[in-house]
């Protein structure tokens, strides 16, 4: 396999030849990165789609709640995503506590961001006397927007590349060790976690009665994301500071296992919860 990868290096696509630049706009005194725009785009499109979802009969919240939720979700993404990255992926940052605040240096965890959003939903729901589980159902349908743009931004940044491979679409990333052709795993994740999962959730929301079964849509999201992430991790290069863990899984796969279990549970038990009358 290693010899085949090396032999394929001459035909591999070079990321540097694509003309990509992590900086979207450079004003001299201010640089706007594609990664920042990805977060903003994901949040705004997610909010817009959420307003369409809650316009349907039987929605668990009003428009004003959706507007408030954007604030809590954004805080949850930033705080949860950063803290989880520090604790699970880069604990050495804790030796310099102020570095935890340096979000512009990169380092966010989806699993932590998801927990942060869940905490924000729970707080907002309790504060307004709403069903936190049903709000999760609706928000889950919007999450693929952020996942898609986030992974595309990873690709534009030339980071989180895949494992060495000899496939015809292999790419050479400038920061990858050994200069070997690798899977563009960022695009795999964008396709599975963003496009495919988004279409699946859209089908279940608009074409079935799933939105009236509390917990079913968020269960589908957890299961769909979990399966996508678990599989793509076999094509994605493990984090250099962690590698493959002693039990044979990467950290990403390990953190995904609870999502798979939770998703299966929510789907299996959705029919046992009180159905919502959408009339």
UniProtKB/Swiss-Prot annotation:
Residue positions annotated to bind a 1,2-diacyl-sn-glycero-3-phospho-(1'-sn-glycerol) are: 151
Protein topology in the membrane? Multi-pass membrane protein
For this UniProt entry, the molecular function terms from Gene Ontology, in alphabetical order, are: phosphatidylglycerol-prolipoprotein diacylglyceryl transferase activity
GO CC terms on record? plasma membrane
Q: Which PROSITE patterns does the UniProt entry name for this protein?
A: LGT (PS01311)
- Pathway participation: Protein modification; lipoprotein biosynthesis (diacylglyceryl transfer)
Q: Pfam families, from UniProt?
A: LGT
On whether Transmembrane is a keyword of this UniProt record, the answer is yes
List the GO biological process terms. Answer: lipoprotein biosynthetic process
Q: Origin, by domain of life?
A: Bacteria
Cellular location(s): Cell inner membrane
Q: Which family does it belong to?
A: Belongs to the Lgt family.
| Name used for this protein in its record | Phosphatidylglycerol--prolipoprotein diacylglyceryl transferase
* Protein species of origin: Rhizorhabdus wittichii (strain DSM 6014 / CCUG 31198 / JCM 15750 / NBRC 105917 / EY 4224 / RW1)
């Amino acid at each position: 396999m290693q010899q085949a990868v090396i032999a394929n290096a001459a035909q591999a696509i070079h990321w540097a030849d694509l003309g990509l630049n992590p900086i979207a706009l450079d004003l001299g005194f201010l640089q706007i990165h594609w990664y920042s725009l990805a977060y903003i785009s994901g949040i705004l499109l997610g909010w817009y789609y959420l307003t369409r979802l809650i316009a349907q009969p039987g929605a668990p919240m009003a428009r004003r709640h959706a507007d408030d939720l954007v604030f809590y979700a954004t805080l949850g993404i930033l705080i949860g995503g950063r803290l989880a990255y520090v604790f699970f992926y880069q604990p050495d940052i804790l030796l310099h506590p102020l570095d935890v605040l340096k979000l512009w240096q990169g380092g966010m965890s989806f699993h932590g961001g998801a927990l942060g959003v869940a905490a924000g939903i729970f707080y907002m729901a309790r504060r307004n006397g709403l069903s936190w589980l049903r709000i999760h159902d609706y928000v889950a349908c919007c999450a693929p927007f952020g996942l898609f743009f986030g992974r595309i931004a990873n690709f534009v940044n030339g980071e989180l590349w895949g494992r060495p491979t000899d496939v015809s679409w292999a790419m050479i990333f400038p920061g990858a060790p050994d200069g070997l052709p690798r899977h563009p795993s960022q695009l795999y994740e964008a396709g599975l976690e963003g496009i495919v999962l988004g279409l699946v959730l859209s089908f279940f929301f608009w074409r079935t009665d799933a939105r009236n079964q509390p917990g079913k849509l968020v269960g589908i999201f957890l299961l769909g994301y979990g399966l996508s992430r678990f599989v793509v991790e076999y094509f994605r290069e493990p984090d250099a500071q962690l590698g493959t863990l002693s039990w044979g899984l990467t950290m990403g796969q390990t953190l995904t296992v609870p999502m798979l279990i939770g998703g299966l549970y929510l789907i299996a038990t959705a029919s046992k919860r009180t159905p919502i009358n959408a009339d």
